[in-house]
Amino acid sequence: KRNKKLGIGSAIRDGMNYALKKNYSVFITLDADLSHEPKEIPSFIKKIKKFDFVAGSRYMNGGTSNYKGYRDFVSRLANISCKFLLRIPFKEFTTSFRAYSNKSLKVLKKATLWSDGYSSQIEFIFFIYMSGLKCIEIPIQFHDRTKGNSKIPRLQAFYGALKLLELFIRRLLTKKK
């Protein structure tokens, strides 16, 4: 149990640490507001048997998103920027619908992870990909929330841009294993 809100990155790292402690073979994350379809979890489980990391993507062939207007523009721009600057062949870096093998959790445990907010999603992909683990994206259906408000603070875009700049510099200085 967490006593206060520390951000999605912090929450996922706590879950990862618990999964490592219990020696789980697979750790799956998805949005609790049903933006992600739980019925798609079997697709992740099937793929994680052959890969170390499986990321859902609403932007690859077969994926969908009902984002419209400004939010769609910002999301697509962020993901295109990540792909271009980090030189990682993914279509999406920002979704939390993912499956991690125990091996990928161990890589992240050893990495220096600083992001507590939404930029942690980019950071996780970066460290897993750069470690040389087998990664794949699969299409997902994304449904924007119908009730409640987004929990993304306004400063998150700024922090995300700083994180992307930091990872870009790391990418220039580091070779993929």
Predicted regions and their residues:
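Acceptor/aglycone-binding surface of glycosyltransferases and processive sugar-polymer synthases
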Residues: 3-21, 38-118, 145-162
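Catalytic donor-sugar/metal-binding loop of nucleotide-sugar-dependent glycosyltransferases
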Residues: 89, 113-116, 125-143
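DNA-recognition element of transcription regulators
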Residues: 122
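C-terminal catalytic/acceptor-binding lobe
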Residues: 132-177
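Short loop/turn motifs at secondary-structure junctions
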Residues: 23-24, 50, 132-134
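Short beta-strand-to-loop acidic/aromatic patch adjacent to the donor-nucleotide binding site
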Residues: 24-33
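Residue-level signature of catalytic and energy-coupling elements of molecular machines
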Residues: 15, 33, 101, 128, ...
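Conserved residues at the C-terminal ends of beta-strands
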Residues: 30, 57, 141
